[in-house]
Amino acid sequence: FDQPDIKATYRLLVTAPAGWHVISAITAADVSTLPDGRSLHDFMTTPRFSTYLFSLVAGPYERIQRSHERLPLGLYTRRSLHNELAQSADEILEVTTQGMDYYADLFGRRYPFSKYDQLFVPEFNAGAMENVGAVTFHDSVLFRDPPTYSQRLIRGEVILHELAHMWFGDLVTMRWWDDLWLNETFATYLSFRSLADATRFRDAWQVFNGQMRPAAYRQDQLVTTHSIATRVEHTDEAVGNFDAITYEKGAAVIKQLVAALGDEAFRAGLHTYFDRHAWGNATLEDFLGALGDAAGEPLDDWSRLWLQSPSLNTIGVTWAGSDGRIESMELHQ
């Protein structure tokens, strides 16, 4: 079961065919050859993290290995996409390392795990998944044809979204699924912020406003909408909240909050949040408490209006008049 507030350590012993790469949250401490020719991969014990963030990926993958400030960085894909990986590797790693440096400065703490692998896998039923130290992506982001600028920007956003989860989601995890927004809202906001501030894709917020925000406007006017922070009774129910409200609307609302508080208070609040909750779990109240302490004002009223209430602000007008002349008019919000 995936109860995010139950964290555990993991120790793996994996027997695999010779020549296979075996990837998990940390690097295997030892790889030995068994009498039958297979390989035994012995992993040391991991740090504590939630069960839904555990991964084991194994296969005859192609690998590109680099490092950033002594942190191992790996890129993996199936052999038939070797050329596509080679063509994309420099840009993928450039965006990754730019994001790592940006987040380390913003959060007041460096990348928290011992290595960072990115695996581009086939037949993956999600765009990407933030497994600790071993993020999986659908391999369609390794472009088969020359990519457009827009395709590269969106790929960069996905890379930085998953990287942000190493702090928001993996290092500090929601206590229960009703705080899914703490993971996805912030990863979306942070990915566009870092994309615009730290990479070549300086127009990222224009893309967000033109392509992402309208999806949230549309969904928020449906009877099926929900608040950003919403009650979830069981794990299956949480699946329905991976949508434009949690991602795009949430990111827009956090951007508004940062503008209201000021960037200095926002940074200070993030530092407090991670100092208090690193390697543990947190709730809406925990996060708002850290930001409110940094800003010197409570955020409960703001939360009720923007995080805990569904639908969007609408403006209507009524008027009265005769003979083609408006004699009175009222605006309603």
PLM region descriptions:
Residues 43, 74-332:
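Hydrophobic alpha-helical and helix-loop surface patches within well-folded domains
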